[in-house]
């Protein structure tokens, strides 16, 4: 058995983690598969400064201090102490995107999870069905509906734990799949589809009359998203009612808008179950807030209050006052008169973009609210808010590193939580805390870059190309976004515009919309070095639901980037004139003369048509080598598509090979020493190949199931850094041993790899004591790498320690009834 062991030593004290090898009988034929890498472990560094998007909350009715958090892109977390600490309980399952969580009130150890976020934004991820735990989240079992991709909500019968109803939203990016209202009567072992509309329509909510469990209400929603558009409604949307436990259903849309309807959010007033509220999205701005006082038979419009069905459109009725209802929206609003008027609740020191709410039935001034910035709690109806600053579920789109001494910094842009930076290591004895992080720009954050010669110059951006130059010393931001010249059409910016800092000339930047821009003065001025490099397709002529739709379709093109934009960009580290870009409509364009002429690369064999070019990468070692990753998940195709060219794009070969079939590729990175060692970030983890993509192996120890949107290498330290979409940043300290892994497939020798020069310092304690000091249990601290030496070594299957040799010898002596001496 071959093993690699990795450990850190501090003075004379050391610890080690073995790269335990799989059983030989289970080993696959490929030598790479036979080497386990469990000793190379990822280090989570947070941050938890701004947390991340929450889909749902489930509070234990018997012990309200215990609750579960469904994170949109970060798994499931549990607290048993009102949020003093949170523990991830879903990290090892096959999905990380969560739409809903439900506690069985008959047995609070039974927890149901619906995977796949139940919103329809551009940044949602997908799941693989329904999960169930019978031990309070310690273990999970997938209970089916694996082709649902997105789950709306889950209802457990109040008297029978075996009876469960599920609103199955179904695929967002394609037709078909599991969608409808499903019911189980055997605890999830089998499911019956009890309500179905069509292949384009799913259900986002189901509710039960608290007085009669046979009375059910359900909201159907027809929607579709692609790279080029979003359509948020259609003839399949509406309200439905059953009075026999779901055996039969009827539509209950009397009084609702007569035009096409979008998403509908519902709630039944526990204070007076005769009252049902609905917030209705509709075409032609005819939506509004509706009320029924006859169990859904008739609906009366109370006001024109609506939110976005793409991202919000959920309501929560107060459990005590029948006239009070809260709407989830950018700014949370409340009505005190049954929907006639609304006002914002007040969120002066709270993150906006709200999605989930719990109102304490015993004190309706006490709420928990889940939003894009994590979890907040109020005890006085939003006059004051407490932020749960210990939930590290930030969604990073991109990651970058600087060359600061002694410890480099890590930068990135987040979904709705700014662009920020922070240290890879700290000198204190407290770990990496929220106070160690700093904001470089506001808004949704995207690609950041750092001047390679001056780590105090940081480039950060928010959505649609709003680029700034941030001075780390002064805190000053200067806007440097390229603006269309006189007589030039406005540029088309992607939500996540690509940015690059030149490796050849100080102060040179590249940035892209539908055209490519170059600056030689740190962004103070820009030169346009290309025409529009997209296909120039009119997205309104493309089909949705199998046909071209009117511009008046519900929410058409809502929350969607302009179509025909550049989304990836790479400057050759070898030749400054060689630049490559990729577009959202499936084109690669290259220039070999600094932008004077561009050549189009199209129709790569094996690549889907019009596929999003998520990453384009020009080799650090060979001017002829290029890598490209296509991401086709917004057309319902989750396969990995990664290709290599060895002749500057003249020909291509697929190197997806043994990458998992389920998991689009987002990013590519190449080692700076070994030209054959490459990495790719996917929807479900990070993989490396020691042979340029011939064979891949996952680097998963210490990393939860999560999307890896971007990868960076800190070359001085040989560190690999991940930007994950829902669990912050992760660092693999000194991965250099992977460069030689090919040498040890058949070796019978042992080896100690080169040791990185360690740093030594005396840990400071600005808080007076090490660790959390006197800050309380909710003080967030991520794992720091202290003053240790990182040592990696390899040994063959004949290796054994002196202790194990002694024990083996003693065992034989004891067996033969001899003295152990």
Q: What are these language model-derived features?
A:
Residues 777, 791-820:
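Short amphipathic, basic-aromatic surface patches that mediate peripheral association
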Residues 1-24:
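Bacterial Sec-dependent N-terminal signal peptides
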Residues 7, 13-16, 609, 786, ...:
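Intrinsically disordered, low-complexity segments
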Residues 21-779, 786-789, 796-798:
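Beta-propeller blade termini and top-face loops
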């Amino acid at each position: 058995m071959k093993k690699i062991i990795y450990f850190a030593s501090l003075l004379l004290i050391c610890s080690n983690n073995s790269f335990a090898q799989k059983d030989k009988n289970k080993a696959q034929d490929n030598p790479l598969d036979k080497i386990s890498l469990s000793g190379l472990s990822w280090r989570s560094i947070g941050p938890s400064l701004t947390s991340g998007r929450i889909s749902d909350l489930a509070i234990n009715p018997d012990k309200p201090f215990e609750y579960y958090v469904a994170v949109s892109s970060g798994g499931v977390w549990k607290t048993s102490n009102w949020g003093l600490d949170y523990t991830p309980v879903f990290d090892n399952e096959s999905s990380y995107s969560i739409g809903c969580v439900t506690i069985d009130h008959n047995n609070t150890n039974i927890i149901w999870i619906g995977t796949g976020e139940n919103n329809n934004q551009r940044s949602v991820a997908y799941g693989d069905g329904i999960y169930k735990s019978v031990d309070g989240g310690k273990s999970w079992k997938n209970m089916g509906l694996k082709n649902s991709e997105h789950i709306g909500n889950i209802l457990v019968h109040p008297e029978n734990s075996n009876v469960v109803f599920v609103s199955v939203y179904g695929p967002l990016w394609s037709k078909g799949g599991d969608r409808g209202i499903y019911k189980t009567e055997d605890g999830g072992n089998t499911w019956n589809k009890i309500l179905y509309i069509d292949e384009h329509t799913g259900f986002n909510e189901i509710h039960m009359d608290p007085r009669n469990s046979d009375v059910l209400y359900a909201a159907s929603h027809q929607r579709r998203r692609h790279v080029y558009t979003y359509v948020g409604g259609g003839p399949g949307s509406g309200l439905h009612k059953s009075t026999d436990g779901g055996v039969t259903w009827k539509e209950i849309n009397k009084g609702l808008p007569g035009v096409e309807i979008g998403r509908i959010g519902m709630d039944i007033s526990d204070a007076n179950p005769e009252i049902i509220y609905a917030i209705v999205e509709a075409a032609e701005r005819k939506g509004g807030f509706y009320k029924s006082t006859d169990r859904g038979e008739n609906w009366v419009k109370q006001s024109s209050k609506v939110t976005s069905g793409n991202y919000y459109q959920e309501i929560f009725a107060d459990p005590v006052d029948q006239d009070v209802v809260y709407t989830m929206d950018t700014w949370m609003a409340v009505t005190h008169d049954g929907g006639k008027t609304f006002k914002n609740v007040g969120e002066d020191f709270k993150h906006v973009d709200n999605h989930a709410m719990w109102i304490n039935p015993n004190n309706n001034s006490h709420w928990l609210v889940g939003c894009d910035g994590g979890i907040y709690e109020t005890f006085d109806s939003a006059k004051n808010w407490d932020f749960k600053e210990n939930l590290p579920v930030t969604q990073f789109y991109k990651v970058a590193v600087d060359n600061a001494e002694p410890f480099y910094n890590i930068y990135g842009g987040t979904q709705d939580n700014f662009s920020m930076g922070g240290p890879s290591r700290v000198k204190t004895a407290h770990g990496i805390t929220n106070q160690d992080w700093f904001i470089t720009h506001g808004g949704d954050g995207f690609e950041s870059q750092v001047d390679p010669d001056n780590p105090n110059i940081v480039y950060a951006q928010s959505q649609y190309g709003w680029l700034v130059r941030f001075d780390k010393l002064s805190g000053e931001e200067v806007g440097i976004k390229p603006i269309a010249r006189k007589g030039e059409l406005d540029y088309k910016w992607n939500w996540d515009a690509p940015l690059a800092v030149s490796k050849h000339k100080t102060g040179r930047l590249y940035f892209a919309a539908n055209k490519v821009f170059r600056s030689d003065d740190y962004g103070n001025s820009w030169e346009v070095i290309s025409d529009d490099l997209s296909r120039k397709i009119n997205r309104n002529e493309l089909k949705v639901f199998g046909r071209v739709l009117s511009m008046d379709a519900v929410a058409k093109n809502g929350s969607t980037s302009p179509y025909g934009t550049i989304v990836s960009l790479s400057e050759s580290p070898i030749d400054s004139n060689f630049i490559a870009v990729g577009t959202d409509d499936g084109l690669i364009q290259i220039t070999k003369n600094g932008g004077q002429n561009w050549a189009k690369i199209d129709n790569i064999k094996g690549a889907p048509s019009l596929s999003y070019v998520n990453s384009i990468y020009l080799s650090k070692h060979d001017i002829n080598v290029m890598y490209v990753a296509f991401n086709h998940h917004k057309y319902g195709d989750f396969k990995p598509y990664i290709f290599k060219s060895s002749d500057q794009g003249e020909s291509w070969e697929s190197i997806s090979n043994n990458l998992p079939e389920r998991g689009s590729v987002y990013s590519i990175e190449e080692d700076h020493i070994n030209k054959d060692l490459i990495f790719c970030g996917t929807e479900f983890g990070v993989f490396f190949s020691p042979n340029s993509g011939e064979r891949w192996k996952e680097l998963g120890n210490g990393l939860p199931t999560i999307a890896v949107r971007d990868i960076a290498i800190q070359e001085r330290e040989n560190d690999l850094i991940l930007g994950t979409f829902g669990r912050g940043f992760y660092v693999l300290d000194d991965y250099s041993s992977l460069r030689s892994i090919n040498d040890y497939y058949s070796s019978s020798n042992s080896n100690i790899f080169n040791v990185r020069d360690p740093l030594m310092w005396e840990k400071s304690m600005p808080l007076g004591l090490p660790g959390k000091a006197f800050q309380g249990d909710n003080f967030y601290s991520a794992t720091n790498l202290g003053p240790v030496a990182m040592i990696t070594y390899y040994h063959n299957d004949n290796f054994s320690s002196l202790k194990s040799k002694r024990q083996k010898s003693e065992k034989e002596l004891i067996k033969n009834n001899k003295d152990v001496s």
